[in-house]
Amino acid sequence: MLVARESLAEHYKEVEAFQTARAKSARRLSKIIAAVAAIAILGNVAQAFAIATMVPLSRLVPVYLWIRADGTVDSEVSISRLPATQEEAVVNASLWEYVRLRESYDADTAQYAYDLVSNFSAPTVRQDYQQFFNYPNPSSPQVILGKRGRVEVEHIASNDVTPSTQQIRYKRTLVVDGKMPVVSTWTATVRYEKVTSLPGRLRLTNPAGLVVTSYQTSEDTVSNVGQGAP
């Protein structure tokens, strides 16, 4: 567009005013964008903080249920707040589950039993158990039996020796393909502690929060003998 010489000064003023207005508008827009971004960041930080504070509330908590004499059902979320007989029942069941999985053997469930016994055990007890069970220990049921046999155990009795020690008697039946079963009775002596800091995933299989700190087992009798026992 041609501009007359006498109008150049006025034209330059208009162009300068237009450019100044555009610059001011751009600065205002930048400030608005920066403010929106800052608000969004603060909102995200606040949301993250709220989620972080709520995470402990979402942890797994075991709930213990029992039936009263009148037939009603009651519950509690802490084993220490259970009635004495109910707390004792939970401890007895947990200790027997430990002994059952430690002393029995089946190739199909060996990994589950291995993991649970390991998680139930204090470091030294866990190390002893794993050294016994893992290859290449010749006494391991994996080596002796593999998939050719199994060991079944049945509960006989549980007795408290001290407040943190229990003796559990059980029947052990060795079944090997093509041989007569070997039945014997054994006694396991289990020393344990109660802990409150177990992760939620472990509480699912260890609701009493027990850690076995010492474990010994000895044979009582052999009621019938087949072709040999591991």
UniProtKB/Swiss-Prot annotation:
* CC annotations in GO: plasma membrane
Record bears the keyword Cell inner membrane: yes
Q: Where in the cell is it found?
A: Cell inner membrane
- Keywords in alphabetical order, please: Cell inner membrane, Cell membrane, Crown gall tumor, Membrane, Plasmid, Transmembrane, Transmembrane helix
- TM annotation in the entry: 39-61
Q: Which domain of life is it from?
A: Bacteria
Primary localization: membrane
Per the record, membrane topology reads: Single-pass membrane protein
Record Pfam families: VirB8
Signal peptide start and end residues? none
Those parts of the protein on the Periplasmic side are: 62-230
Query: Cytoplasmic face: residue ranges?
Result: 1-38
**Keyword Transmembrane, does the record have it?**
yes
The protein's job, in short, is: VirB proteins are suggested to act at the bacterial surface and there play an important role in directing T-DNA transfer to plant cells.
Q: Which family does it belong to?
A: Belongs to the virB8 family.
Q: What is this protein called?
A: Protein virB8
Organism (species): Rhizobium radiobacter
What gene is behind this protein? virB8
